[in-house]
Amino acid sequence: MRYQRPKGTADILPGDSQTWQFVEATARQLFANYRFEEIRTPMFENFEVFSRTSGDTSDIVTKEMYDFKDKGDRHLSLRPEGTAGVVRAFVENKLYGPETQKPYKVYYMGPMFRYERPQSGRQRQFHQIGVEAFGSDAPELDVEVIALGMNLLGKLGLTHLRLAVNTLGDQETRTAYRQALIDFLEPHFDELSEDSKVRLHKNPLRVLDSKDKHDQELVADAPSILDFLTPTATAHFDRVKASLDALGIDYDVDATMVRGLDYYNHTIFEIMADSPALGEGYTTVLAGGRYNGLVEELGGPEMPGVGFGLGVERLVLLMQAEQVAIPDNHPLDVYVVGIGDQTSLATLKIVQAIRQSGLTADRDYLDRKPKAQFKTANRLNAAYTLTIGEQELADHTANLKSMATGEEISVPLADIYQDFQNVVATKFTAK
């Protein structure tokens, strides 16, 4: 029987994986520049970690969680997003204490799991890269996180980006706005989708995020949260906008934008790309915001946080659509050609010596003729070939050839075994 991968998953094969490695390496380097350090959390957590943080009415909790009971009757869930697990680790390991530098800045990357309809750039097992910063409610930290996201996408070769920002205000703001939304939508209750009917009194802000077209038409004329901001919330958002202006980062204020998770407050943002690879119009690639109550929700003290997450599958699709050049970080330096049965052990030793000197090397393992081996070296774009036949074996030498110039020299095997990099640097004029 031939087995296939589960629906909503993908095999990332060599060739494609180079792009993923480039994304991850670029992210790691940039995160280090911003002084974010890596954190790794389990791929499954107690179910309540996600149900308490994502919100009981969110699509993630109500429709998309991969949750199960283990043999100890513990209710567990595969992680549907990265933030909740990071916050749980922050609280459990008491990283909120005074001995830990604040803001406490970390990043993560890895697979997440949601049961949703697979489509372009959206899988049931998908990969997310994200950052979180705890311990400061400064609007400038919001902007640092936004700038980091914009910088990352730019370094990965994406253009035609649009940054949308909004504020969900503080608790007083949302309480007043929540009631205003209910008052506005209640007369249209029978026209709402079934999901929005459930959400109207539990979390009416989520109706604004409905994918139902009729819901979208109804909320088009809804009150704006910007009209309900407290002076404190207004001051925070004004500083965010002023900081973005100071950095020369273009943005639009989208007063209708809410995030798909219930834990956000104050600043929220989405970075979108305009590419046919993900359908018509702008599509969100990276999104995040501030979540000042999340640490408390998971048993910690009052501690503000801000972060973002991006979907790697969507990002890779965009990079491919924009034909972003991926550097070859592992070119083949030397292909070793062995001629004759007697040279097999010597070829093995030579390849190992070249690798130990810090260069990349390969050889034939299929008993191919010399001509076929040289063709392989050409196809693999080897910088050099190193050929050893029975005569060279008897003379304790090998022939080193530059594939770029055709220049060829004879090299003692002892020199190759001792330091092949030095051989290339001192005895070979064609680099």
From Swiss-Prot:
It catalyses: tRNA(His) + L-histidine + ATP = L-histidyl-tRNA(His) + AMP + diphosphate + H(+). Gene3D superfamilies: Anticodon-binding domain, Bira Bifunctional Protein, Domain 2. It comes from the Bacteria. GO terms for molecular function: ATP binding; catalytic activity, acting on a protein; histidine-tRNA ligase activity; transferase activity. Keywords: Aminoacyl-tRNA synthetase, ATP-binding, Cytoplasm, Ligase, Nucleotide-binding, Protein biosynthesis. It is found in: Cytoplasm. GO terms for biological process: histidyl-tRNA aminoacylation. Its EC number is 6.1.1.21. It is an enzyme of class 6 (ligase). One of its GO terms (cellular component) is cytoplasm. Coiled coil: none annotated. CDD domains: HisRS-like_core, HisRS_anticodon. SUPFAM superfamilies: Class II aaRS ABD-related (SSF52954), Class II aaRS and biotin synthetases (SSF55681). Belongs to the class-II aminoacyl-tRNA synthetase family. Homodimer. This is Histidine--tRNA ligase. The lineage of its organism: Bacteria, Bacillati, Bacillota, Bacilli, Lactobacillales.
